[in-house]
Structure formats: C-alpha cells, structure tokens
Amino acid sequence: SSRRNLELVETMREKQKKGSLLWVLDKTKTAMGARMLRSYIEQPLINKDDIIKRQDCIQELSDSLIDREELREYLNPVYDIERIMTKISCKTANPRDLIAFRNTLEMLPHIKRIIGNFHSEEFAACYDKLDDLADLYELINSAIVEEPPISVRDGGIIKEGYSKEADELRDAKIKGKEWLSELEIREKERTGIKTLKVKYNKVFGYYLEVTNSFKDKVPPEWVRKQTLTNAERYTTDELKHLEDVILGAEDKLYSLEYDLFSEVRERIASQVVRIQGTAKAVAMIDAYASLSVVATQNNYVRPKINDKGVIDIKNGRHPVVEKMISNDMFIANDTYLDNNSNRVAIITGPN
C-alpha cells in the first residue's frame, strides 16, 4: 500500500509509468538495466556502507562523462540476455535469437574495457564478474549464418565451413539445381516448347510445366502428373532421378542443420552460470549509468549519509513534481528533521 501511494513505479490512478519516480530515473539502455533499476527503487538500500558504495559508482560515472557516454553507446545494442537465456534453456531459441545474442556478446569486451577505468569497489567487483564470453561468441559466429531464418527445420542455418558433412550435402543440393536448369534448357531446345519451365511444389515435387498452346509438342515418353486450366504438368525418368538426388540431399541437410543448431544451443545453455553473472553485471552498470545521467541532467547533488537521526535538505526539489510542471514554476524547499524538537508525527486510524 505504501509503495502504491508513493507512486514509485506507476501512478495510482492511471497505472502508468509517466508521473512515477521510475519515469524520472529511468534512462537505461537495456531491458535488464530497466528491471534492475526498478528493483533498486522498490527495494532501497538501508545499510550505510552499501549506499555509499552505490554513490561512489554514480559519482565516478558523473565525473567521467566521456567514458559514461561511450559505455552507454555500447549498452544500447545489448539484447535482453536474461530473456534469451530462458529461451535457450527451454530449447525455444531460434537462429535469429542466437545472432542477436552474438551481437550482444560483441559489445561485452568494450563494456569491460571501460569499466576497467573505474576504481570504486562495486565496479571492481563488476569487472571481475563480467565475463566477455569470447568462446561463445566464436562458437555462434563460426556456426550460424549472418541472416538465418526463424525456423529451425527448413535449413539455411549453418555457415559454410562449420561442418564438412553439411558442406558436402549443400554442394549436392546446389549441383542438383544446376542439373535442373540444364535439363530445362536442353528440353526446350529438343522439343521447341518455348514456355517450358521446371517447377516444384511440396505435393507433386519437381515437374515440367507446359502451357496448353504447346501441348502438341510434348514427347510421348513424358508422363502426365497434373492437368490445370491453362497448362499440363509432366515428369520424366531423368527428372525423377534428379528429384531423388536433390530432395534426398535437402532432407539430410535440413536434418543435419537442425542437429548442429541444437548442439550449439545446448553448448550455450551449459554456460548458464557464466552468462547469468555477466547479465547481472551489465544490468547493474546500465542502472548506475542511468542514475548518473539523471543526476547530471537535473543537477542533483550527492547526499551525505549519517546515522545521527538528522535529515537536513537545502533547496530540496521533488523529482517528479519538478518534471510535471515548468521548472520556472517549481520552488525549492528546505527540510530539517531530527530526533529532538524538529519532528513530524503521522497519526492514522480507521477514520
């Protein structure tokens, strides 16, 4: 109830992010960072040392604007690692998910390099946790084509050179297509059927299509497969043989590519602990960078934390109210509270 009334992550009436504290503070670049920042707001630190450690990180980022902005540039294309790992673990990740994951892994060495420039305790620990996962990057980069299909069953997934067997089947498939092209040209010349086309569908396989105007030129050895309104479809012994070669190679290739893709996915899944550690580190970096950006843009100051029971605020500004109205209209206020005479009592009851 208190969280809802404080409108920390959404407004009470509209249930919208705009108008909440999260709306003001969220300048994150990644989905993971956004979730981490939300958890910071919903579960604030209460230990003085932990608060100071977090402040140290935000201070370092604010004092190093060039590093911070470069860091945010590398965070921007980072995919939701936590989400994709769920898909990988559940074996629902498709080839495009792995390419998106690879593109994210490409950013990690740059992020780690920049974090190495900072010296606060939290960033030092973060640097150690952030594994650049270079082996997984190389695995995906060597195995999966640059622009794969979504489906894992229709081939076109595995890169040339990754599997000798897949390369051999791919060559057989390509040569088969060349043979079909040669057959079409040869039969056109032999029969004089200018509109002759070698076509394919999943029901009838490969066939020779002849428009009705050329039906009288069809050789007697051709076997009719289907009659259409404007054309006839035929097959020959040679075409049947080529179909067996091509479809046999295709079926084997698609099956092999699926197995190879599944193997790559399983190898990534086996590294879940490393990946989760890196995801958490990236999320923390993004959340801290967001808080630093907000602090810089709004000229926030770093509060001094004390355990003396004193709250002393000079020119305090409500972060949400200030953003909801014109800055010229907002009036800053001082606040002083302590455990002695300067106290506020909130009396509550059923009425």
Q: Which residues does each predicted region cover?
A:
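Alpha-helical coupling/stalk and coiled-coil linker elements that connect catalytic or binding modules
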Residues: S1-P350
